[in-house]
From Swiss-Prot:
Role played: One of the primary rRNA binding proteins, it binds directly to 16S rRNA where it nucleates assembly of the body of the 30S subunit. With S5 and S12 plays an important role in translational accuracy.
NCBIfam families (UniProt xref): PRK05327.1, rpsD_bact
GO molecular function: rRNA binding; structural constituent of ribosome
Keyword Ribonucleoprotein included in the entry's annotation: yes
Full protein name: Small ribosomal subunit protein uS4
Organism: Thiobacillus denitrificans (strain ATCC 25259 / T1)
Classification of source organism: Bacteria, Pseudomonadati, Pseudomonadota, Betaproteobacteria, Nitrosomonadales
Self-association state and partner proteins as the record states: Part of the 30S ribosomal subunit. Contacts protein S5. The interaction surface between S4 and S5 is involved in control of translational fidelity.
Amino acid sequence: MARNLDPKCRQCRREGEKLFLKGEKCFTDKCAIERRAYAPGQHGQKSGARLSGYGVQLREKQKIRRIYGVLEGQFRLTYKRADSRKGVTGENLLSMLESRLDSVCYRMGFGASRTEARQIVRHNGIVVNGRRVNIPSYQVRPGDVVEVAEKSKAQLRIKAAADATATRGYPEWIEVDAKALKGTYKAHPQRSELPSTINESLVVELYSK
């Protein structure tokens, strides 16, 4: 299966902000953005060229794709589905990205990063409403109960991620029992509950051309 093999820290430096792709490392002073807050490459420290309007839109799309770990084809398909729904297209897009099973598992603390959560899903480590689901892009619906499969609950990486996430706290749209490694997706997130550093309207402008 195709995936982005670019080093995670390099991706954050390219966007000039933390994308939280490396789990706990992102919350420490070992984070690459803390050490080298400039673009990667030979001319990274000198890169001050202004982007065109199209360049700004493209950069924002790339940033959102990297945050959620979605490839171009998947992202475009998600956008088309978001555009066909009632409501604001950009907000629909973010809601659909957040309701992906891998993203929900990450938010619930079943993986230290979305990448790790995606691996756990693919390896049959997650159960939704009592049924095993191994498709990371599976759309979780309000009221769905998501939990770590019994055979995977002993994994140290899952326990460590669950403990760390419980310490930081959970988003309002989910409810989690960290000890049972089980949670409920209560509702789709409101736009005000998602990062203000994301400008989804730029993606809408890009795809509307």
